[in-house]
């Protein structure tokens, strides 16, 4: 990193050099603004290299004096990031108190912060889900509740994976993210984390996601992991419970709104996933040869079809051949809300005849994770029987009209 002083059109500018390439130079000026100039119009008066401070990283840190023990497992994402205002770069939070910072939480709980990984959520893979699940299992020996801080973009995938892998839970596992980094005045980090920690202190025996209820502060809701989805790119209330009400809400205390599984006496982890599963998003113009390439070597494929669960008729033979080979094709809907029903139209009935399985009202991403879990732990022989069972509340007995829970 370099401090520089330049002259541009008779004006001196001091700051930190961010980038110098392709005929341009970008500086983080002393006033905090990023300024980019044509390199040919700039005279550099001085360059001074400054040594970057190395941030101390500790795998486990403990805070608080409360009786209830809660573990926070950090995996990365916006919630665990801050902006370095010297350079404009995004860096990991060095002080875990920025995530939950508040004397009230520290007086109520004994909080352990465990750094598991530092990954942007889009870079996480099924192997990371397994690694995280095993770390959670280890941490249950120390705490009565688990919070996982995670990037929001793929949080529904990871949380669903842990929901399926934990056959039994003796304490809650609450995933939490944020839409704005912890150093920003508009950050939702602390409120989301406060809600997550309080949800983790209940008798819940499930995996959930804690995020804002609305765009304003004041209320955090808990979504069942296997019924939730990120439905907005940037709003604080980006997550929704699909076709159902959320599990609980936190303002100053926790209030449950629907039935939930209670914590059991012990944990049971089934940590095998078959990674040879993929998702195909049907669209007009999708050709058979492309589908064949996408599903080659796969053991199962989740199809995001139109409406009640349809694809173009000329693609049906591809999936018929796929299922004939002992593989599994699963139909979900791009509509997200509502349920697949392949018995209504002729295309659906042809898909059934081709061996395509209906996922019913399962969220597509959840069906994808469930297929990986089912193949990994039960194999092909038991796949249809297990996949069609309601394992963690991912299948609804009835759909609730959307206007009821928005």
Swiss-Prot record:
<dbReference type="InterPro" id="IPR006034">
    <property type="entry name" value="Asparaginase/glutaminase-like"/>
</dbReference>
<dbReference type="InterPro" id="IPR040919">
    <property type="entry name" value="Asparaginase_C"/>
</dbReference>
<dbReference type="GO" id="GO:0006450">
    <property type="term" value="P:regulation of translational fidelity"/>
</dbReference>
<dbReference type="InterPro" id="IPR037152">
    <property type="entry name" value="L-asparaginase_N_sf"/>
</dbReference>
<dbReference type="GO" id="GO:0006412">
    <property type="term" value="P:translation"/>
</dbReference>
<keyword id="KW-0547">Nucleotide-binding</keyword>
<dbReference type="InterPro" id="IPR036152">
    <property type="entry name" value="Asp/glu_Ase-like_sf"/>
</dbReference>
<comment type="similarity">
    <text>Belongs to the asparaginase 1 family. GatD subfamily.</text>
</comment>
<feature type="active site">
    <location>
        <position position="230"/>
    </location>
</feature>
<protein>
    <recommendedName>
        <fullName>Glutamyl-tRNA(Gln) amidotransferase subunit D</fullName>
        <ecNumber>6.3.5.-</ecNumber>
    </recommendedName>
</protein>
<comment type="function">
    <text>Allows the formation of correctly charged Gln-tRNA(Gln) through the transamidation of misacylated Glu-tRNA(Gln) in organisms which lack glutaminyl-tRNA synthetase. The reaction takes place in the presence of glutamine and ATP through an activated gamma-phospho-Glu-tRNA(Gln). The GatDE system is specific for glutamate and does not act on aspartate.</text>
</comment>
<dbReference type="InterPro" id="IPR011878">
    <property type="entry name" value="GatD"/>
</dbReference>
<dbReference type="InterPro" id="IPR027474">
    <property type="entry name" value="L-asparaginase_N"/>
</dbReference>
<feature type="active site">
    <location>
        <position position="152"/>
    </location>
</feature>
<dbReference type="InterPro" id="IPR037222">
    <property type="entry name" value="GatD_N_sf"/>
</dbReference>
<dbReference type="GO" id="GO:0050567">
    <property type="term" value="F:glutaminyl-tRNA synthase (glutamine-hydrolyzing) activity"/>
</dbReference>
<dbReference type="GO" id="GO:0004067">
    <property type="term" value="F:asparaginase activity"/>
</dbReference>
<dbReference type="InterPro" id="IPR027475">
    <property type="entry name" value="Asparaginase/glutaminase_AS2"/>
</dbReference>
<dbReference type="InterPro" id="IPR006033">
    <property type="entry name" value="AsnA_fam"/>
</dbReference>
<dbReference type="Pfam" id="PF17763">
    <property type="entry name" value="Asparaginase_C"/>
</dbReference>
<feature type="domain" description="Asparaginase/glutaminase">
    <location>
        <begin position="68"/>
        <end position="390"/>
    </location>
</feature>
<feature type="active site">
    <location>
        <position position="78"/>
    </location>
</feature>
<dbReference type="Pfam" id="PF00710">
    <property type="entry name" value="Asparaginase"/>
</dbReference>
<dbReference type="GO" id="GO:0006520">
    <property type="term" value="P:amino acid metabolic process"/>
</dbReference>
<dbReference type="InterPro" id="IPR027473">
    <property type="entry name" value="L-asparaginase_C"/>
</dbReference>
<keyword id="KW-0648">Protein biosynthesis</keyword>
<dbReference type="GO" id="GO:0005524">
    <property type="term" value="F:ATP binding"/>
</dbReference>
<comment type="subunit">
    <text>Heterodimer of GatD and GatE.</text>
</comment>
<keyword id="KW-0436">Ligase</keyword>
<feature type="active site">
    <location>
        <position position="153"/>
    </location>
</feature>
<keyword id="KW-0067">ATP-binding</keyword>
<dbReference type="InterPro" id="IPR020827">
    <property type="entry name" value="Asparaginase/glutaminase_AS1"/>
</dbReference>
